[in-house]
């Protein structure tokens, strides 16, 4: 702004008066006042200069601009420095990351070596495991038996964990060589599963080495387990380790590895990734692994597929473990094949069991990888070309899965089974949360989960043992699963292909092929891996889920162990091998993978076969998972691409392929499995889901996982029992938690597929939007499609379980003893698994459907869950996601509501998955919660809605809402999907309802005594306040320092409490439309508290972390709560008024209250207004909930402003309503509705009738929504920096006021929000303000006459809205009795209260106050540019109203100027800016602006020799208006205040004029609405003028001026509506209202003020009024006399002059009227500085009048001292008239014969000036305010010219600049007035005084002073040229007079003319 100000303002200055600014720079003749500073030699000039270093306005302006520019430059420099520092920090971080990557790469290298050794060991282990697998398959042939055996195997594994670990170290070295050997053998013998695995491991040497290195680092790692376990197991362990390590590395270094991966080999990055994981960078590792995977998959799609298959296999293994029951059935079918594969895989798993135990947390996810690796190994054999990479990936991934399995086994054994399940569910949710953090993590999440597992494996070496035990069990389990799950595995693996399951797999795979291929196209390498993973996950759907969850786990994206546990527990229940969480998942997966184990090779072979279809899909899946892993950078990009492309290419299928492929095959397979292996596959799916849940649980606190595990176990048992019942459902549920989401949306055919699609979408979407957001949307999408699908119920249960688990986790169940549970689960769960296949089902089975019910409740409970979760979230990684998400959400929260409504639906429509990511920012937790809710509440709906349209849109929609409501809206959203229109109004209430449900009545009763059926508003408010106290009590429990999240939780709980209270109350006694009232209340509560929760003030408080932060924050919150209560009370009053307000107060009481409020205290009025405002706001919020949710964003405010503009009538009505209320509160209370209906029938306002109220509320909401929004808590940006860019004028005013008054912005935004609600349409408000500003009588008149007119309709409400709430803050500044003299642009704020006080009618005074507030809002919007208000607030007159005569420091003035310039540039119109500038100047003057301070003399005495001061009245980019005023003390601040008021008004009036013109054009319409108020104002003006004439206006002036301002505001408002009509109408109105003037005379004080405002806003009207008054009063001569008298009486000769001028103008044209108005305005100002010659200062606004006043004052306050005054008055009038040439002429003639003579002379220069003035005036009425300014300027110019023609010219130039928008007539008039003999005399006098002010403009050429011109010289030239017309004769005369050469005079005149023209052009 500063820069702009400089450019704009400086340019404006230059353009306006180029010479002056270029004083020394421009040596050309245009340097009019170049020597002004030096030239000022007079002591007077010196004195003036003393106040302003020089009289050169331009210098001041330039100085100010320079200061502003410098400040801006300094700020920018600081910002630049900060940015540079940030760059340095980022570069430092980058270098650190690079170093880390290098280290990781090195570590990966060493890990590769270790892995090769492990591979060797693994071969041995594989052999051993193969044998064991065969044995296990035999045992697995029977489920219960298998489970027991598996559990025993697990126990064995756990027992052999240490031996395995020992072996691990031993075999590690062997493995290295083996790895090398294996690579080729595997490649050569892809059929050999061992070799395949070894080969995959070898090919994944990086992964293997990573795993090995991890294992090495964790000497206890599964390497030993692998070795000890079996050669195969060791080999598997190597692979698993490598896979796990790779996953970990990928997880930890994935992001880093993205870059490294692109530059480095997969192995190297993975080594680095492994190192990173070892270093504890699971996320990075996951990412790098994703990259590595993507690269590997890129290099070899088959390998990628194999890897993916492996991942899927491991995921599937988990699922298989869960699905063991079914899998066993299937495995019986494919037992032989699967036994072989399963043996290999089981050997891997045996290796992995120790790893899994170690990695159990991670391994739940990694197991799929391990299995997948096994699959990949097989696939690698099948696909020798790609085996190396695939094997690498496979081995590494497998290692990860193995490791993860081991860890997960341990975790599950500890009770992680339930945790595993919960983790799995959470994994789908929290994983989505974390994946939200790591957008890639949803798909890659699986891979990452495995990767996380390795990371965890590092942390959990013991899990290796458990994993080993689990693997042993898994081997047996897998044997069984091979027996039972072979078909299932065939679906997912080659063996699956053998069976119909294989067909299903192929079916899914083809789908994957479709989607994944396109995904592969998007990122072939990544897609290859993802495709492999997805394809494998197709074979291993559960595994795919597990892969995601594993991935998440690897990335620490996994949900807390609680979630994992449930999955694991379910796995243990379902699978004998499940007992160890990892082992269970793995065992299951292995069972399924038993079949999968065989299938992996088969699956991978299948993949190879289906590879043509699936390779790319697999790759896509791998790519997706890899992308997710590497998503940090690439994820967002690639995954978005994948998602988008997949969406575009594959559409739903592709999305499934992309994200769902991992899980999609599973859904298809699961569906097929339902048919074939229904129970087994479902269990498999359950296993996968549980694995995912366990992974999710991992994300959550592990203890939570434990509890979740237990819960899940219970549910599992139930689920197992119900497993068969709802196998399909369970499968879907599992898919839903894990892959179902991914497949859900895209594989709509497969219910599970859509579910999977959702998951994938979640993963994909997360990458696109935000990790958490994306993931969460995906989850929601997932839930929606799942809802659509059968999984709906099952999925719902899963989410519910997840929620329950989450709750448990949150509650501290997360203290779960993973290890203990693992051990216990290994034993107990295994046992349970055998007997409880159904209980395992709970995850997938009817128990889950029950969970669905629970989920539905959970959705209700989710709010609590959210709160508790959030409370505990800090401990969860999810929390961080949630935090970041919520931060993002914060920023977008309000927009989100809107977005929810529109964008959300749209985005959902576009890409439920993709756009969810992009369109929504959501914390994972929110997403998961939202998903749960969606699953719960939206499931039916979503199933109908989401599934049909893929429900992605609906899902996204819900996602958005979830995000917005932190997941609470998730439920809401589904509901809203169905009732989207309802969502905006109901979403919050529905949310609230859920919250209320969550917050039971009993819980509320514990907090406060509930009166469920309150009989009075007071009872309701009392309960609300008690709740507020409870909130405070909770808040005060915080320590001095607490986190933002804690605060958010407090606020969220407060929202919940309040909304719950509102929901539980039966308000039927109070209100008829209870639901509407409750909705309104809830919406207001939510919107307000959300704003409290998320706004810049709170953020800054937390950022600053001050010692008193807690106190300050609560102060803010308390204020907001008070504001909220007021708002709620208003809503209640509104709703209760129609019903039983008598319960609280009778209607009469209300009316009394209103009256009291308006009359007795601003506070009361404020309260009432606030109530009304709140009512309106509530209504508004109902209709504009979305907007409100925008948190009054600046854009929203702008939009609201636009809305207000569009709804100008509404706003007007509001204003009028406010006005009416203010004028007649009782009447308004009674007639408000009538007024509303009458004045805004089309725009019903909140009224008495609630039914009516809703519509009215909508209209009012729209109208006041803007204002309300404008005054809502300022956005962070707004609060932090007073940017008016996006800030509405009202808000600017509010901010400015707050800053100046020191009132907290929060107060303003909070309490005053309602007040200022209507202030946004300041200009429109002006109409009602004008009416309001009219004295109470006039107001009543208006009310009575135009009761139906808008003025009264909203006046009280709106005024309260506008000023009452803000009034107090305003009153804080305005409370000081503001003298009209003090009235400043800034003072206007003050004046509003002062004026209100000043007015006899407190009511009108309050009205005035709002009006002034409006004016200030406008002006402040203009002047509130930036730092200056803060800088100068101490000097601001309204801050120091009493210091009227004290001079405002120049810096303050300059600050105002810069503000104005900035403000104008930013968002203020030129008119407003001009006003602001002038106002600033006047405010400076009023507070004794620089030149006012110079003329310290309180009384203006006409001293021709006194120096004149040029005051910049207007400054803008284009131009600046300079008022040349006498420095004499006579220029009292009052003048400037009047000027300021006028200027401020002018700025408003300009719009107002337009409105007025329009009104006149549409006199009937506007007369009824606006015109009458305008007429009243005019009458008031006339009355004021008469009062001034008749009464001594001194007192009146003060009061009157304020009314004038208000009137003016009203007029301005009217004018805003009808700008063009103003002039004519004003004449008519004035004429029409002339008779009314007498009536208005009573209101004269306010009227007089109104004239000022009118002058500015409705100059014509004011002129008309004056004209009327003049006509009524006397002839021109009489008028002049009267004017003189008035000036004396009022100490406002100016006012008299103005009136005189008006009288003259009455005969004159509208321009003349404008000029007259200016005079009147000046008169008000002048009345303040009566007879103060400083009319020059007023010149800009009312300076000319002031000059006259000065003379008059000097002569005496009595008009008779006028003789000179009269001449001056004539001059002034003429000057004003000269503003409009026509009127000028008329005036001249009317005034006197002498004036015409002089007029001719003056008119010549005036004509010159008129050129510019005409240009300014050319705008016509719209510029009438400027014209007034210009006229005033001209007057002061005339006076100045009297002082000195040169000075006059200067002043004229400035005036012309100021009156750019005014017509030249003003100048002519001023000149002609000066032309009068007295004018000549005064000119002579002035000529003397200019000496002081006559800083000679030194015209230099080549450094030589040729001519020096004083301002007096310029004035003289201009005056004479105006009078005599520019001619040689005139120039000669002037040359003699000025001792110059006629040519010089002529040249000077031309220069001045050029200046004026230039300013005109500007």
UniProtKB/Swiss-Prot annotation:
CDD domains the UniProt entry points to: CASP8AP2
Bias kind Basic and acidic residues: ranges: 164-184, 252-298, 308-342, 348-426, 456-512, 524-533, 604-615, 888-901, 929-938, 962-996, 1246-1255, 1785-1801, 1831-1841, 1849-1865
Free-text tissue specificity from the UniProt record: Highly expressed in heart, brain, thymus, lung, testis and spleen.
Disordered: annotated span: 141-202, 223-547, 563-588, 596-615, 871-901, 919-998, 1152-1171, 1238-1268, 1784-1878
Modified residues (Phosphoserine): 20, 560, 798, 858, 923
Chief localization: cytoplasm
Transmembrane domains' residue ranges: none
Any one GO BP annotation for this protein: extrinsic apoptotic signaling pathway via death domain receptors
Keyword annotations of the record: Acetylation, Activator, Apoptosis, Cell cycle, Cytoplasm, Mitochondrion, Nucleus, Phosphoprotein, Repressor, Transcription, Transcription regulation
Cross-referenced Pfam families: Myb_DNA-binding_7
Coiled-coil ranges (or none): none
Biased composition (Acidic residues): 919-928
Region (NCOA2-binding): 1688-1962
Location relative to the cell: Cytoplasm; Nucleus; Nucleus, PML body; Mitochondrion
Extent of the signal sequence: none
GO molecular function: cysteine-type endopeptidase activator activity involved in apoptotic process; identical protein binding; protease binding; SUMO polymer binding; transcription corepressor activity
Composition skew (Polar residues), residue ranges: 223-234, 428-438, 874-887
Recorded superkingdom: Eukaryota
Name of the protein: CASP8-associated protein 2
Species this protein is from: Mus musculus (Mouse)
Gene: Casp8ap2
């Amino acid at each position: 702004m500063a820069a702009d100000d400089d450019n704009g303002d400086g340019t404006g200055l230059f353009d306006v008066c180029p010479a002056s600014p270029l004083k020394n720079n421009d040596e050309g003749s245009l340097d009019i006042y170049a020597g002004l500073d030096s030239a000022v030699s007079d002591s007077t000039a010196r004195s003036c200069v003393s106040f302003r270093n020089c009289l050169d306005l331009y210098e001041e302006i330039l100085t100010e601009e320079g200061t502003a520019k410098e400040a801006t430059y300094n700020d920018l420099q600081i910002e630049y420095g900060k940015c540079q520092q940030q760059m340095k920090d980022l570069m430092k971080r980058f270098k650190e990351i690079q170093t880390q990557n290098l280290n990781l790469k090195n570590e990966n290298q060493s890990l590769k070596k270790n892995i090769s050794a492990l591979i060797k060991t693994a071969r041995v282990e594989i052999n051993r495991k193969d044998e064991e697998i065969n044995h296990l398959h035999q045992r697995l042939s029977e489920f219960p038996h298998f489970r027991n055996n598996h559990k025993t195997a697990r126990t064995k594994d756990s027992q052999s964990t240490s031996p395995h670990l020992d072996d691990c170290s031993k075999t590690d070295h062997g493995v290295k060589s083996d790895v090398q050997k294996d690579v080729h053998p595997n490649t050569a013998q892809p059929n050999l599963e061992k070799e395949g695995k070894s080969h995959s491991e070898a090919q994944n040497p990086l992964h293997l080495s990573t795993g090995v290195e991890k294992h090495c680092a964790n000497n206890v790692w599964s390497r030993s387990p692998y070795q000890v376990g079996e050669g195969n197991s060791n080999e598997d362990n190597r692979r698993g380790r490598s896979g796990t390590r790779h996953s970990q590395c990928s997880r930890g270094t994935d992001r880093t590895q993205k870059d490294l991966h692109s530059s480095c080999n997969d192995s190297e990055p993975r080594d680095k990734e492994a190192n990173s994981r070892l270093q504890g960078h699971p996320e990075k590792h996951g990412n790098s692994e994703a990259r590595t995977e993507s690269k590997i998959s890129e290099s070899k799609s088959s390998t990628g597929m194999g890897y993916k298959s492996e991942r899927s296999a491991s995921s599937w293994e988990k699922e298989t473990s869960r699905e063991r029951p079914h899998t066993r059935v299937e495995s019986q079918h494919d037992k032989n094949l699967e036994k072989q594969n399963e043996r290999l895989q089981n050997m891997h798993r045996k290796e992995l069991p120790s790893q899994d135990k170690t990695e159990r947390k991670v391994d739940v996810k990694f197991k799929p990888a391990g299995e997948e690796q096994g699959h990949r190994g097989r696939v690698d054999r099948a696909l020798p070309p790609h085996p190396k990479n695939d094997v690498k990936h496979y081995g590494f991934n497998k290692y990860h899965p193995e490791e993860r399995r081991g860890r997960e086994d341990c975790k599950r054994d500890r009770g992680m089974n339930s945790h595993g399940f919960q983790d799995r569910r959470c994994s789908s949710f929290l994983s989505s949360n974390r994946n939200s953090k790591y957008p890639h993590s949803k798909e890659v999440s699986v891979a990452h989960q495995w990767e996380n597992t390795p990371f965890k494996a590092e942390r959990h070496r013991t899990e290796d043992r458990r994993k080993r035990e689990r693997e042993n069990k898994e081997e047996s389990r897998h044997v069984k699963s091979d027996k039972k799950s072979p078909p299932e595995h065939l679906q997912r693996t080659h063996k699956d292909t053998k069976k119909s399951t294989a067909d299903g797999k192929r079916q899914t795979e083809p789908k994957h092929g479709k989607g994944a291929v396109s995904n592969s196209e998007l990122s072939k390498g990544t897609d290859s891996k993802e495709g492999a993973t997805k394809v494998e996950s197709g074979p291993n759907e559960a595994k795919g889920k597990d892969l995601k969850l594993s991935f998440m786990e690897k990335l620490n994206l996994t949900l807390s162990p609680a979630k994992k546990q449930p999955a694991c527990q379910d796995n243990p229940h379902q699978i004998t091998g499940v007992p160890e969480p990892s082992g269970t998942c793995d065992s299951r997966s292995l069972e399924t993978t038993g079949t999968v184990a065989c299938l992996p090779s088969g699956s991978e072979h299948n993949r190879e076969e289906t590879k043509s279809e699936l390779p790319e899909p697999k790759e896509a899946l791998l790519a997706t998972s890899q992308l997710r892993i590497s998503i940090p950078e690439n994820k967002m990009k690639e995954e978005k691409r994948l998602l988008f492309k997949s969406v575009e290419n594959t559409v739903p299928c592709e999305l499934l392929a992309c994200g769902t492929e991992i899980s999609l095959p599973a859904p298809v397979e699961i569906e097929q499995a339902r048919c074939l292996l229904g129970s087994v596959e479902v269990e498999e799916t359950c296993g996968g889901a549980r694995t995912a849940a366990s992974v999710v649980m991992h994300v959550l606190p592990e203890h939570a996982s434990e509890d979740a595990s237990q819960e899940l176990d219970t549910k599992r048992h139930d689920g197992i029992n119900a497993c068969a019942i709802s196998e399909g459902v369970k499968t879907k549920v599992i898919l839903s938690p894990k892959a179902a989401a991914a497949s859900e949306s895209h594989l709509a055919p497969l219910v599970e597929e859509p579910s999977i699609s959702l998951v994938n979408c979640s993963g994909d979407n997360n990458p696109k939007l935000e990790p958490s957001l994306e993931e969460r949307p995906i989850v929601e999408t997932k839930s929606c499609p799942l809802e659509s699908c059968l999984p709906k119920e099952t999925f719902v249960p899963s989410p519910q379980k997840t929620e329950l688990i989450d709750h448990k986790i949150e509650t501290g169940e997360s203290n779960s003893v993973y290890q203990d549970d693992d051990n216990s689960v290994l034993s107990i769960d295994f046992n349970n698994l055998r007997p409880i296949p159904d209980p395992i089902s709970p995850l997938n089975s009817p128990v889950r459907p029950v969970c669905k019910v629970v989920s539905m409740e959970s959705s209700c409970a989710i709010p609590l869950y959210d709160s508790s979760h959030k409370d505990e979230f800090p401990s969860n990684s999810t929390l961080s996601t949630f935090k970041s998400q919520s931060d993002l959400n914060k920023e977008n929260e309000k927009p989100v509501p809107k977005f929810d409504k529109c964008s959300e639906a749209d985005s959902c429509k576009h890409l439920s998955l993709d756009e969810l990511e992009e369109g929504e920012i959501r914390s994972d937790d929110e997403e998961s919660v939202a998903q749960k809710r969606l699953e719960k509440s939206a499931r039916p709906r979503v199933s109908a809605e989401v599934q049909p349209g893929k429900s992605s849109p609906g899902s996204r929609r819900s996602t958005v809402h979830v995000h917005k409501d932190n997941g609470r809206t998730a439920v809401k959203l589904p509901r809203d999907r169905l009732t989207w229109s309802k969502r905006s109004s109901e979403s919050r209430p529905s949310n609230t309802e859920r919250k209320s449900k969550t917050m039971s009545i009993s819980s509320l009763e514990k907090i406060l005594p509930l009166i469920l059926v309150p009989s009075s508003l007071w009872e309701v408010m009392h309960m609300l306040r008690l709740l507020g106290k409870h909130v405070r009590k909770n808040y005060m429990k915080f320590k001095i320092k607490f986190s933002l999240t804690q605060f958010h939780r407090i606020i969220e709980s407060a929202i919940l409490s309040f909304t719950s209270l509102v929901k539980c109350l039966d308000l039927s006694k109070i209100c008829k439309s209870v639901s509407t009232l409750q909705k309104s209340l809830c919406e207001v509560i939510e919107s307000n508290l959300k704003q409290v929760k998320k706004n810049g003030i709170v953020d800054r408080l937390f950022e600053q972390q001050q010692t008193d932060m807690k106190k300050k924050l609560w102060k803010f919150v308390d204020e907001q709560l008070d504001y909220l209560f007021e708002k709620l009370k208003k809503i209640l009053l509104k709703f209760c008024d129609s019903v039983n307000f008598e319960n609280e107060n009778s209607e009469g009481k209300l009316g009394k209250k209103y009256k009291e409020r308006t009359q007795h205290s601003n506070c009361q009025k404020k309260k009432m207004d606030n109530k009304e405002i709140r009512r309106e706001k509530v209504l508004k919020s109902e209709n504009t909930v979305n907007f409100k949710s925008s948190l009054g964003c600046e854009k929203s405010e702008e939009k609201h402003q636009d809305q207000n503009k569009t709804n100008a009538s509404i706003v007007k009505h509001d204003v009028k309503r406010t006005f009416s209320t203010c004028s007649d509160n009782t009447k308004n209370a009674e007639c408000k509705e009538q007024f509303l209906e009458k004045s805004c029938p089309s725009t019903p306002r909140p009224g008495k009738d609630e039914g009516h109220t809703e519509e009215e509320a909508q209209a009012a909401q729209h109208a006041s929504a803007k204002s309300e929004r404008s005054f809502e808590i300022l956005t962070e940006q707004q609060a932090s920096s007073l940017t008016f860019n996006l800030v509405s004028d009202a808000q600017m005013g509010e901010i400015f006021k707050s800053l100046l008054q020191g009132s907290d912005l929060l107060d303003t935004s909070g309490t005053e929000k309602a007040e200022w609600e209507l202030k946004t349409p300041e200009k429109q408000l002006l109409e009602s303000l004008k009416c309001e500003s009219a004295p109470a009588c006039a107001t009543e008149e208006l009310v009575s006459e135009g009761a139906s007119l808008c003025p009264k309709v909203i006046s009280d409400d709106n005024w309260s809205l506008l000023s009452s709430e803000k009034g107090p803050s305003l009153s804080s500044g305005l409370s000081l009795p503001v003298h009209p003299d003090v009235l400043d642009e800034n003072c206007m704020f003050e004046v509003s209260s002062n004026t209100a006080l000043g007015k006899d009618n407190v009511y009108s005074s309050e009205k005035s106050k709002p009006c002034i507030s409006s004016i200030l809002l406008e002006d402040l919007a203009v002047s509130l540019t930036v730092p200056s208000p803060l800088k100068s607030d101490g000097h601001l007159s309204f801050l120091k109203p009493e210091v009227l005569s004290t001079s405002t420091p120049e810096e303050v003035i300059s600050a105002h100027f810069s503000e104005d310039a900035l403000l104008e540039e930013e968002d203020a119109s030129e008119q407003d800016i001009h006003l602001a500038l002038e106002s600033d100047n006047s405010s400076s003057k009023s507070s004794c602006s620089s030149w006012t301070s110079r003329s310290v003399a309180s009384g203006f005495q006409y001293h021709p020799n006194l120096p004149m001061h040029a005051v910049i009245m207007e400054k803008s980019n284009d131009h600046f208006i300079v008022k040349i005023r006498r420095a004499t003390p006579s220029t009292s601040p009052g003048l400037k205040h009047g000027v300021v008021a006028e200027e401020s008004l002018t700025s408003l009036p300009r719009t107002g004029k337009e409105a007025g013109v329009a009104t006149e054009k549409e006199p009937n319409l506007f007369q009824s609405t606006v015109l009458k108020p305008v007429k009243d104002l005019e009458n008031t003006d006339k009355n004021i003028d008469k009062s001034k004439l008749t009464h001594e206006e001194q007192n009146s002036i003060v009061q009157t001026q304020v009314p004038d301002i208000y009137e003016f505001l009203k007029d301005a408002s009217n004018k805003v509506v009808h700008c063009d009509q103003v002039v004519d109408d004003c004449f008519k109105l004035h004429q029409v209202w002339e008779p009314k003037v007498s009536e208005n005379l009573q209101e004269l004080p306010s009227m007089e003020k109104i004239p000022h405002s009118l002058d500015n806003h409705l100059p014509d009207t004011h002129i008309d009024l004056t004209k009327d008054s003049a006509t009524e009063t006397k002839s021109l001569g009489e008028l002049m006399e009267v004017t003189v008298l008035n000036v004396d009486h009022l100490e406002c000769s100016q006012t008299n002059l103005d009136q005189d001028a008006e009288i003259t103008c009455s005969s004159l044209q509208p321009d003349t009227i404008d000029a007259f108005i200016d005079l009147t305005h000046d008169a008000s100002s002048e009345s303040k500085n009566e007879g103060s010659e400083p009319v020059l200062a007023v010149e800009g606004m009312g300076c000319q009048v002031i000059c006259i006043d000065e003379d008059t004052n000097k002569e005496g306050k009595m008009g008779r001292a006028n003789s000179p005054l009269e001449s001056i008055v004539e001059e002034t009038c003429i000057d004003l008239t000269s503003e409009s040439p026509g009127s000028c002429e008329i005036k001249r003639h009317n005034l006197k014969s002498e004036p015409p003579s002089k007029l001719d002379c003056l008119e010549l220069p005036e004509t010159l000036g008129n050129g510019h003035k005409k240009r300014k005036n050319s705008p016509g009425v719209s510029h009438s305010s400027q014209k007034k300014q210009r006229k005033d300027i001209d007057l002061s110019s005339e006076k100045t010219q009297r002082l000195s023609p040169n000075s006059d010219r200067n002043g004229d130039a400035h005036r012309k600049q100021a009156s750019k928008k005014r017509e030249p007539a003003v100048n002519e008039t001023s000149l002609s007035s000066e032309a009068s003999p007295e004018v000549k005399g005064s000119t002579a006098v002035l000529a003397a005084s200019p000496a002081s002010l006559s800083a000679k403009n030194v015209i230099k050429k080549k450094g030589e002073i040729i001519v020096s011109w004083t301002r007096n010289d310029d004035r003289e030239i201009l005056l004479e040229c105006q009078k005599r017309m520019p001619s040689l004769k005139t120039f000669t005369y002037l040359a003699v007079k000025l001792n110059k050469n006629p040519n010089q005079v002529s040249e000077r005149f031309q220069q001045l003319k050029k200046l004026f023209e230039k300013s005109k052009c500007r």
